[in-house]
């Protein structure tokens, strides 16, 4: 079966509208999990206010800002940064794992029970979390160097969670296979990832202009919208990999 962008777009659109309720629920659940973890972090409010009130133009301005901090502020900033990274990874892994399990549950001819699917999710979660950490770290290094390497790494590593789920491979094998397949089919996978990135940028720009809306409400709308957008990308990539395995 030939793999085309139009075919994947049609299948993604069909699945999204067929399971829109479940996707919304998962997106909202991941957002509230994010909020719940944020409540437990309880950071130093002085550090949070400093981070929110300072606009860092580039890495050098951030480094200069950190150098001017005292030792206690540096310690609090490091702790806050680590906790925020963990919060983001847990939320992303929950969303990613839930959508993958949902697509798998719907796609399988022999239906699993909901209990079995939940069990699969919890077994899959630890390895997916570590994979997310590794791929996020690699992609961020790419973005620190230049924009293009970051985008390219985002594309070629995008299949790794789905390969990990299907093949039950080791983490590095999933990354290696993702790089090989994604590079080979970059003209098909690339548009999906770029659509997601552009969508994130447009949403961020649009929501930044709603200054009259309460900050917490805006955060909620932003997170749910971003999660739905990411879910669409996962559906697109999952469908690609299903067709790829059959071809």
UniProtKB/Swiss-Prot annotation:
Cross-referenced InterPro entries: UPF0259
Main location group: membrane
Pfam families: UPF0259
Family per similarity comment: Belongs to the UPF0259 family.
Transmembrane regions listed in the UniProt entry: 20-40, 85-105, 114-134, 137-157, 188-208, 218-238
Key words of the record: Cell membrane, Membrane, Transmembrane, Transmembrane helix
Keyword rRNA-binding: no
Keyword Transmembrane helix attributed: yes
The protein's name in its UniProt record: UPF0259 membrane protein BUAPTUC7_273
GO cellular component, one term: plasma membrane
Location relative to the cell: Cell membrane
Membrane topology: Multi-pass membrane protein
């Amino acid at each position: 079966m030939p793999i085309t962008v139009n075919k994947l777009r049609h299948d993604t659109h069909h699945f999204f509208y067929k399971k829109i309720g479940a996707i919304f629920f998962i997106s909202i659940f991941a957002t509230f999990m994010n909020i719940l973890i944020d409540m437990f972090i309880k950071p130093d409010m002085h550090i949070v206010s400093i981070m929110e009130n300072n606009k860092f133009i580039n890495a050098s301005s951030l480094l200069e800002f950190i150098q001017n901090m005292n030792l206690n502020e540096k310690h609090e900033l490091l702790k806050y940064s680590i906790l925020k990274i963990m919060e983001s990874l847990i939320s992303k892994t929950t969303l990613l794992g839930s959508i993958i399990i949902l697509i798998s549950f719907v796609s399988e001819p022999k239906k699993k029970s909901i209990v079995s699917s939940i069990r699969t999710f919890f077994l899959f979660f630890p390895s997916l979390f570590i994979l997310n950490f590794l791929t996020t770290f690699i992609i961020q290094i790419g973005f620190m160097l230049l924009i293009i390497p970051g985008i390219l790494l985002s594309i070629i590593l995008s299949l790794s969670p789905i390969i990990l789920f299907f093949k039950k491979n080791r983490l590095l094998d999933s990354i290696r296979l993702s790089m090989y397949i994604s590079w080979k089919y970059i003209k098909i996978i690339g548009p999906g990832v770029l659509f997601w990135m552009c969508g994130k940028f447009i949403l961020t720009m649009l929501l930044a202009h709603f200054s009259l809306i309460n900050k917490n409400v805006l955060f909620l709308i932003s997170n749910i919208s971003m999660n739905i957008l990411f879910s669409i990308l996962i559906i697109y990539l999952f469908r690609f990999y299903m067709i790829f395995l059959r071809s």
